Amino acid sequence: MGDPREQFAATLFGLYPDFLPTQGLYLDLEGNGSGSENILSFYWPALPGARRFSWMRRSESTDISYAEIRTHIDSIGASRARWIVVYSAGQESPDERERLIGLLGQDLFPGSSWINLLHVTQQSRRIKSSIREHRNVWYARDQVRVRYSLEALEWEFGIERPVNIRSHSYRYRDLDGGCGHMEVLATAQRSMSESATEEEEQSLRDYCEADVKNMFQVAYASEQLLFTRSERRNRRVVRP
């Protein structure tokens, strides 16, 4: 298995053998992780393309409530999601799940399985080696340290973000070591206070969409790499 992406795919479906990428809800939170989140982003592949991404933002004075999220999840049909997919610290049990429970006071998806693509990356020796060798993305405060970030994984799968939705916390090889332009938490604060420019609002939306959409693209490409067309069809057959 020479292609690092193939080992990533084998690791993903080895850890989660029943996982169907088109039936997962891809989720991301932007905030401080202390019981108050600024943005929740969702990507639900069951919907037509233009409607797959949605997001919720808190106001300056009010947190996003359980009732609001429950209504939103029901409205997009994602309450039936079998898997919740994130890219999060926390190994197999992702921090993102605990942050969501901390925000809402209860588990929004009690019957769903959580998949942490960072955990998959950390378990895939070849993809980690490839990320280090390519050095497409590294941590801005440390010229040596290469993080196994979502953006680094995206590069391995041929996904390239525009510079305006690359994180200012990272430096990039194709920018000659320059940083990305997106300061997501600061931009989110300006959005909540209604002081963000129209361009900033659009970049913030595009950044949040990329975070969840690109997780789906990585998972979907992994299934394509690992299984033949007939195998993929058989995986979707409902058995008694």
Question: Which residues make up each language-model segment?
Answer:
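N-terminal accessory regions of nucleic-acid-interacting proteins
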Residues: 1-25
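Conserved DEDDh/DEDDy metal-dependent 3′-5′ exonuclease domain
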Residues: 50-174
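Acidic, Mg2+-coordinating catalytic module of metal-dependent nucleases/exonucleases
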Residues: 152-239
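Short conserved beta-strand segments at catalytic cores or DNA/RNA-binding microdomains
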Residues: 36-49
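Beta-sheet entry/capping signal
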Residues: 23-24, 82-85, 223
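Short acidic, Gly/Ser-rich segments with clustered Asp/Glu that frequently serve as metal-coordination loops
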Residues: 26-35
